[in-house]
Amino acid sequence: MTEASSGPAAKYPLTPSVMHALEVSKRGCDELLIEAEWLQKLARSEATGVPLRIKLGLDPTAPDIHIGHTVVLNKLRQLQDLGHQVIFLIGDFTSTIGDPSGRNSTRPPLTREQIEANAQTYYRQASLVLDPARTEIRYNSEWCDPLGARGMIQLAAKYTVARMMERDDFTKRFRSGIPISVHEFLYPLMQGYDSVALKSDLELGGTDQKFNLLVGRELQKEYGQEPQCILTMPLLVGLDGVEKMSKSKGNYVGVTEAPNEMFGKLMSISDDLMWQYFTLLSFRPLAEIDLMKQEIAAGRNPRDCKVLLAQEIVARFHSQADAEKALEDFNHRARGGVPDDIPAVSLSGAPLGIAQLLKQANLVPSTSEANRNIEQGGVKIDGATVSDKAVKVAAGTYVVQVGKRRFARVTLA
C-alpha cells in the first residue's frame, strides 16, 4: 500500500528544534510514513503553539506488561516531552472483535468486564512511563457503539476485499485454507475509524500493525481530514537474544518485577543485545551511547555500560535507591553472597520433597519447573547444590536458592 504525500500544504520554518524533534521521533523506529509530512506537522506545531495529537491504540487482551511493551510507550513519552498530547486509546469495542494481526487463526474476543479490568492494570503500569498530564484516556466504544448496523455498513463500503487481502496474514490464511471470518475484516476498519474520531496527527504501533495504521490514514482522507503519519517500532528481542520478548517464551522482564529480579535479568543479556536495549529502552542521548561503543572498542568492560542500563530501567519502574540497592545485591551475589533482604517463608509438612518446597516457597511456578532447575544444577540449600529430585528436606531453617537471583529463607516445621 503506497501513496503520494497529502499532508500539510503550508510550509513552516524548519528550525533546529524542529529538526531535533524529527531526530527524536525517528530514534529506534522501524518506519516513519510519511517523513516529509511529519516534519511539516512538527514545524506547524512549533509555529502555532498547537500540540500534535499522537494516538496509541491498545486492545488490553492481557493485564500485565513487560519492558518489550514499553518500547512504544517510551517513544510516546519522548514525544510528550516535546510538548505533544498522547491519546491512550482503550479498544474496548475492538477487543470484542479480536485483532487478527499476525494470527493464523481467529483470535477469541473478550468480555467488556475482562477488557476494563485489563485496561486499568495496563494503564496503571503504562503510567510509570507516560506523563499523565499530557495523556488523554479514551475508549473507542464512545463512537463505535453509536454507529449501529447502518453506520457499520457505510464504513465497510469505504474499503474493498481486495485491499483487505493485501494483509500478509489474511493472504496466508486464505492460501492455506484457514477460515477468515467476515468480522475480522471489520477490525482494521474500526481501528482506522478511531483515527477519524480522534483526528490524530500520528499513530504509533508495532511493525505488525502497519496495515491497520495505513487504513486509518486512508479513512481520514475519506472523511476529509488531514491524514495521520505513521510510526512503527520494532519488537524488542527477549533475554535469550533470539526471539521477541514474550511471557510465553519466558524471556521477558516484567515492569512490576522486584528490583533485584529486574536488575539481574537485564545484566544477563548479551553484550551485542545491550545496544538494542539502549536504543529502544534508554532515554540517554544517542551521542552518549555511541561514545560508550567507542570506549568498549578501546577496552572498557561492557559490564560497566550494562550496569548503567540496568540501573536506569530499575529506577524508572521503582526508584533510584532501589536501583542502587539492586546493584549492591547483584555484586554481593556475584561474589557468592546472599542478599540481605531475601523473603522469609514458613512451611509445614516436614520432611518435604524438594520440588514441593520450592513451589510452596514461591521460588518456582510449578514442580516441573523445580525439577528442571534441579536437573540443571540450579538449586542450592545453604550453598550446597541439590542434584537429586527425590531429596526430602527435614525440619529446620535454610537459605534456598534457585538460579542466580531467587532466594528465600525457609523455615520448615
Curated annotation (Swiss-Prot):
> Where found in the cell?
Cytoplasm
Which stretch carries the motif 'HIGH' region?
60-69
Motif 'KMSKS' region is found at 244-248
This chain's function reads: Catalyzes the attachment of tyrosine to tRNA(Tyr) in a two-step reaction: tyrosine is first activated by ATP to form Tyr-AMP and then transferred to the acceptor end of tRNA(Tyr).
| Catalytic activity as recorded in UniProt | tRNA(Tyr) + L-tyrosine + ATP = L-tyrosyl-tRNA(Tyr) + AMP + diphosphate + H(+)
Q: Biological process GO annotation list?
A: tyrosyl-tRNA aminoacylation
The family line of this record is: Belongs to the class-I aminoacyl-tRNA synthetase family. TyrS type 2 subfamily.
Subunit and partners: Homodimer.
Q: Which Pfam families does this entry report, sorted A to Z?
A: S4, tRNA-synt_1b
Record's keyword annotation contains Protein biosynthesis: yes
Q: Which SUPFAM superfamilies match?
A: Alpha-L RNA-binding motif (SSF55174), Nucleotidylyl transferase (SSF52374)
Q: Where is the S4 RNA-binding domain?
A: 352-412
Q: Which gene encodes it?
A: tyrS
Q: What highest taxon heads this organism's lineage?
A: Bacteria
Residues given in the record as ATP binding sites: K247
Official protein name in the record:
Tyrosine--tRNA ligase
Q: GO: which molecular function terms?
A: ATP binding; RNA binding; tyrosine-tRNA ligase activity
Q: Which GO terms describe its cellular component?
A: cytosol
Question: EC number(s) for this protein?
Answer: 6.1.1.1
| UniProt keyword list | Aminoacyl-tRNA synthetase, ATP-binding, Cytoplasm, Ligase, Nucleotide-binding, Protein biosynthesis, RNA-binding
